[in-house]
């Protein structure tokens, strides 16, 4: 399938997950449900791979997780990507986060973020005041790495950081 891909994602502790999901739920509560994938953990995408590399990527993920300590992140930003179709909350791009990303691929043009909504620009602009109202800077924790395949969504593996 040409549309299939693997996605390696940094996952959060329960408190961070709940906090981010709560902000996203406020969007759903006002009818802004978007086009993004539902029923997956809040996350930061680290890298994508072709599906043929599943075994290799799973082994790499397990090795990296065993060598990497869980770490804190500071969520301090709200953003919209060029084109106006993605609204996100972003942590500071600190050394721990960059180090984890670079274990999977270069971080030069990478924007670490957790997507709140993917939708048409007019809906993103409606969603922005909701996120602004609900969001204030907070500290969270990256505690795991997930491996998913997309289209259709399939959870492959979650490994806790040490």
Question: Over which residues does each language-model region extend?
Answer:
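Charge-rich, low-complexity N-terminal segments
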Residues: 84-86, 108-109
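Short, surface-exposed loop motifs enriched in S/T, G, D/E and P with embedded aromatic residues
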Residues: 70, 74-76
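A structured binding-face within diverse protein domains that lines the active/interaction site
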Residues: 89
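Basic, often amphipathic N-terminal segments
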Residues: 1-70, 92-141, 154-162
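Short proline/glycine- and acidic-rich turn/helix-capping motifs at secondary-structure junctions
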Residues: 76-85, 144-155
């Amino acid at each position: 399938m040409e549309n299939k891909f693997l996605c390696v994602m940094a996952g959060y502790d329960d408190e961070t997950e709940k906090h981010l999901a709560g902000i996203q739920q406020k969007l759903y509560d006002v009818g802004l449900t978007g086009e993004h994938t539902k029923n997956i953990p809040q996350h930061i995408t680290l890298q994508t791979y072709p599906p043929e590399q599943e075994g290799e990527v799973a082994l790499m993920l397990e090795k990296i997780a065993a060598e990497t300590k869980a770490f804190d992140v500071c969520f301090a930003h709200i953003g919209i990507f060029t084109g106006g179709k993605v609204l996100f909350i972003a942590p500071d791009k600190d050394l721990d986060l960059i180090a984890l990303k670079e274990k999977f691929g270069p971080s030069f043009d990478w924007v670490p973020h957790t997507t709140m909504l993917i939708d048409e620009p007019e809906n993103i602009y409606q969603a922005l005041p909701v996120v602004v109202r609900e969001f204030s800077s907070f500290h969270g924790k990256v505690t795991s790495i997930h491996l998913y395949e997309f289209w259709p969504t399939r959870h492959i593996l979650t490994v806790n950081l040490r």
